[in-house]
Swiss-Prot record:
GO MF annotation list: ATP binding; N-acetylglucosamine kinase activity; zinc ion binding
Binding residues for ATP: 4-11, 133-140
Catalytic reactions of this protein: N-acetyl-D-glucosamine + ATP = N-acetyl-D-glucosamine 6-phosphate + ADP + H(+)
Record carries keyword Kinase: yes
EC number of this enzyme: 2.7.1.59
Gene name per UniProt: nagK
Organism: Shigella flexneri
Transmembrane segments: none
Protein name: N-acetyl-D-glucosamine kinase
Length: 303
């Protein structure tokens, strides 16, 4: 059996998958915020419960935000303070007496989608998350591409391209990002960015679901806003797709529930790509909240 953990700031979610990659059991517990020992105990107790339930010693994979394992062997994850700065993989491997594999949660999302039965035909899969932030991951021939610092796929911290400033106006504000830079596309293309753009142009503080509801009702202002957002998304993706050239782009995160994102994006891409480039297939993520657990479990299927 394959155990996949999706660990965030508020919850530790475990999914148990069989050899057919089907979910057999799942359980969630709160994430301890202050004690590393309590954090380790929470993970180990879930593993012990799964081992007993299924009568086996399952493999363990973990998806977690941040940098799962740097050169010093430690995890760096601001959202998981109890474990940040600790040698999480080594400590869990020792306590559980098995090989524990860690990866960035966005990479696990991409891996989950790349291993979907419908998508395994595609050699190079790009996962794109449009949620609270903007992130993603790359999977080539069924294996995640992590990079030296586990930041492959941090698309949200690419800067706005010149064409975006031409489109939006040269006085368009380059917002300061949490990473310390200015003009990162995450500040405009995330769910929060979607709402910020609306307020910037129309001076109304609406949240993304409210704007989308107006769009669905035919509101002209909301429709103009969505057109602008999709144009900005397309021009920003142009640079990424030119570098990566994926066969498939799978979009997850809260904004992926808005059908216009996946149905209208492809037609806007050709003018931002090389003339010889082929627009990749663009699909909404298939596995929703289970994606992180799936991808983490499948880290042991990539050998």
């Amino acid at each position: 059996m394959y155990y996949g953990f999706d660990i965030g700031g508020t919850k530790i979610a475990l999914g148990v998958f069989d050899s057919g990659r089907q979910l057999q059991w799942e359980k969630r517990v709160p994430t301890p915020r202050d004690s590393y020992d309590a954090f380790l105990d929470a993970v180990c107790e879930l593993v012990a419960e799964a081992d007993q339930r299924f009568g086996c010693k399952g493999s363990v994979g973990i998806g977690i935000p941040g940098m799962p394992e740097t050169e010093d062997g430690k995890l760096y994850a601001a959202n998981v303070p109890a474990a940040s700065g600790k040698p999480l993989r080594a400590d869990l491997s020792a306590r559980l007496d098995r090989d524990v594999r860690l990866d960035n949660d966005a990479n696990c999302f991409a891996l989950s989608e790349a291993w979907d039965d419908e998508f395994t035909q595609y050699p190079l899969v790009m996962g794109l998350i449009l949620g609270t932030g903007v992130g993603g991951g790359l999977v080539f021939n069924g294996k995640p591409i992590t990079g030296k610092s586990y930041i492959t796929g941090e698309f949200g911290h690419m800067r706005l391209p010149v064409d975006a400033l031409t489109m939006m106006g040269l006085d368009f504000p380059l917002r300061r990002c949490g990473c310390g830079q200015h003009g990162c596309i995450e500040n405009y293309l995330s769910g929060r960015g979607f709402a910020w753009l609306y307020q910037h142009y129309y001076h109304q503080p609406l949240q993304a679901p409210e704007i989308i509801a107006l769009y669905d009702q035919g509101d002209e202002q909301a429709r103009a806003h969505v057109e602008r957002y999709l144009d900005l998304l397309a021009v920003s993706l142009g640079n990424i797709l030119t570098i990566v050239d994926p066969d498939l782009v799978v979009i997850g995160g809260g904004l992926s529930n808005f059908p216009a994102i996946t149905t209208q994006l492809a037609d806007r891409l050709p003018c931002h790509l090389l003339p010889v480039a082929r627009v990749p297939r663009i699909e909404r993520a298939r596995h929703g909240d289970a994606g992180g657990m799936r991808g983490a479990a499948f880290l042991h299927l990539t050998d």
